[in-house]
Design a protein with these regions (language model features):
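Generic recognition of long tandem-repeat/solenoid scaffolds
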Residues: 85-88, 106-108, 124-129, 134-135
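Fold-level signature of zinc-dependent metallopeptidase catalytic domains
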Residues: 4-19, 125, 130-205
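N-terminal prosegments of processed precursors
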Residues: 1-119
């Protein structure tokens, strides 16, 4: 990553928005074969934090993609085009790094502030979630899903000897589906939300 100048400000305080360049060679390398690696994570003060990245998956072998059509529900094949990593700093999980469709989404917490790196208007921006002018950010969608789960009292709890296990389904309505270019793109978005929720639950174990 490197920092660049931008006029695209998505926060009330312009100091809470930074434009970053993504090293495409690094992105390709990650997509191909990296399971664990060290990353220099960009911070809002234009410095970097050395963090550990560890690959994980939210997809089970029984994963199904079900599409509602005029003829009823259809189960279709899904070829994963999605990589997810936990971001760890000093032994603690602080966020997720998601790589799909030749792009990335990063969400992490540092110094009690929640940050996100996402592609907005064809530009990668790092911004403070709590100062953001955009209502439907990735981090906000993850928080909404967590609140929904917390309100439900019947989700499975694991024993203290084993990690928490959640079975989640994400239902996408027609309006939301039409904001994406394909079923694969829509599915990747849903998996990204689940991966974000997974990181929060994993960090609480």
């Amino acid at each position: 990553f490197s920092y660049t100048v931008t006029d695209n400000i998505v926060t009330l305080n312009e100091e809470n928005t930074k434009s970053v360049n993504v090293n495409r060679f690094l992105l390709d390398q990650i997509s191909e074969n990296s399971n664990d690696f060290i990353l220099k994570l960009p911070l809002i003060n234009e410095s970097f934090l050395d963090v550990n990245m560890k690959k994980f998956s939210v997809l089970s072998p029984e994963h199904k993609l079900i599409i509602e059509t005029s003829n009823g529900k259809e189960t279709v094949d899904y070829i994963p085009n999605f990589q997810s990593y936990y971001i760890s700093y000093e032994g603690n999980s602080i966020g997720t790094f998601l790589c799909f469709e030749n792009s990335i989404v990063i969400s992490y917490k540092y110094n009690n502030r929640q940050f996100e790196i996402n592609k907005i208007d064809n530009e990668f921006l790092l911004f403070d979630i709590n100062d953001c002018l955009i209502s439907k950010t990735f981090s906000c969608e993850v928080e909404k899903k967590i609140e929904q789960l917390s309100a439900e009292e019947n989700y499975p709890e694991s024993s203290s000897a084993s990690p928490k296990c959640l079975e989640l389904a994400v239902e996408v309505d027609q309006h939301t589906r039409n904001t994406f270019s394909s079923n694969t793109t829509t599915t990747n978005w849903a998996h990204a939300i689940i991966a974000g929720v997974s990181q929060v639950y994993a960090s609480e174990v």
